[in-house]
Amino acid sequence: MAVKIKVTLVKSPIGYSENQRKVLKSLGLGKMGSSVVHDDTSSIQGMIRKCAHLVAVENVAE
């Protein structure tokens, strides 16, 4: 059973680099307050680290 995490966009990416905005889009986050649930993989963790100052992460019980 894979561990799931919920990623929520809590800060606007306006004024931050284009790379960080692309990472947010690839995570599936568009608008402030939007949330997505992903498997906790190393690639997702790397994307979260790139924009950690813009998102909130929490574990989801499956």
From Swiss-Prot:
Record-stated family? Belongs to the universal ribosomal protein uL30 family.
Q: Which domain of life is it from?
A: Bacteria
Q: How does it assemble?
A: Part of the 50S ribosomal subunit.
Put simply, this protein is called Large ribosomal subunit protein uL30
* An example Gene Ontology CC term for this record: cytosolic large ribosomal subunit
Cite a single Pfam family from the UniProt record. Ribosomal_L30
Record-linked SUPFAM superfamilies = Ribosomal protein L30p/L7e
Please provide, alphabetically and separated by semicolons, the GO molecular function terms listed in this UniProt record.
structural constituent of ribosome
Q: Could you mention a single GO BP entry for this protein?
A: translation
Q: Which InterPro entries match?
A: Ribo_uL30_ferredoxin-like_sf, Ribosomal_uL30_bac-type, Ribosomal_uL30_ferredoxin-like
* Keywords annotated in UniProt: Ribonucleoprotein, Ribosomal protein
Q: Which organism is it from?
A: Desulfitobacterium hafniense (strain Y51)
